[in-house]
Amino acid sequence: MIDKILKLKKEKGYVILAHNYQIPELQDIADFVGDSLQLARKAMDLEEKKILFLGVDFMAELVKILNPEKKVIVPDRSATCPMANRLTPETIEEYKRKYPNAPVVLYVNSTAECKTLADVICTSANAVEVVRKIESDVILFGPDRNLAEYVAEKTGKKIFAMPEDGHCPVHQFSENSVDIAKKKHPDARVVVHPECPKPVRDKADYVGSTGQMEKIPEKDTAKTFVIGTEVGMIHKLKKKFPDRNFIPLESAICVNMKKNTLENTLLALETESFEVTLPEDIIEKARRPILKMFEIMG
């Protein structure tokens, strides 16, 4: 099946982009594997006109927004993000009425419609830097309350989370898990995602996006790392650092990320039917705050 996928991909001129949370078999056949920021940048640099995206819907939409002239297909239309879907345009409008002078910073894990109402988009890798560079001490941030809290801690700014209870179910690790991991692996470094709750972040040795997690073993010589994010990241880390040990903090599985399989990836290439499409006005309006992010990042 893998040979069939690679043959079809080449014949039809597709590039396969995969998120770090995809199953190992899909990561291994992808042309590029990365976090949402890395994938967004990669998509803009591609010469190819056809992209098979392995992730969830908001990420595929992001690729389409940045590459409206390219054909973007996905293996499973139902692969979505519950956290992104918690935030609605109506909620953003409500907060904007309450705080009319506060800029709206939206996490990339948001719908295309919501992005049209943002002043700037951010990712978990650059959220702190983006907010720090905005000339306002009050920020409206959504849809992840934990990332909002983390950014507030790092920048000292007043941040209102939209909605108040937005969070990623996969990253709701327990403080107890960190205690157990440290007891079991006393020499290990605990690395967690900023989408984790504050008590978990506070007990970790490092807090960072999946892209940042990849860089930690380059500067830290520890032999063992306990990783607090979706389990798909373990495969990426083991491939990059085969001489180190990577242990999941908990068995955290994103069922939506796992909807993509070798079988439906092959089917997607055969039929090219699940194409990502967005209205032109949505693409145009959602593109502005994304490009603003790149401008801020320099």
Curated annotation (Swiss-Prot):
SUPFAM superfamilies: NadA-like. It holds the Pfam family NadA. Iminosuccinate binds at residues 19, 36, 107-109, 124, 193-195, 210. It is found in: Cytoplasm. Keywords: 4Fe-4S, Cytoplasm, Iron, Iron-sulfur, Metal-binding, Pyridine nucleotide biosynthesis, Transferase. Disulfide bonds: none annotated. Pathway: Cofactor biosynthesis; NAD(+) biosynthesis; quinolinate from iminoaspartate: step 1/1. GO terms for cellular component: cytosol. Binds 1 [4Fe-4S] cluster per subunit. It catalyses: iminosuccinate + dihydroxyacetone phosphate = quinolinate + phosphate + 2 H2O + H(+). Signal peptide: none annotated. GO terms for molecular function: 4 iron, 4 sulfur cluster binding; metal ion binding; quinolinate synthetase A activity. Its cofactor is [4Fe-4S] cluster. Gene3D superfamilies: NadA-like (3.40.50.10800). It comes from the Bacteria. Its EC number is 2.5.1.72. Belongs to the quinolinate synthase family. Type 2 subfamily. This is Quinolinate synthase. It comes from Thermotoga neapolitana (strain ATCC 49049 / DSM 4359 / NBRC 107923 / NS-E). The lineage of its organism: Bacteria, Thermotogati, Thermotogota, Thermotogae, Thermotogales. The gene is nadA.
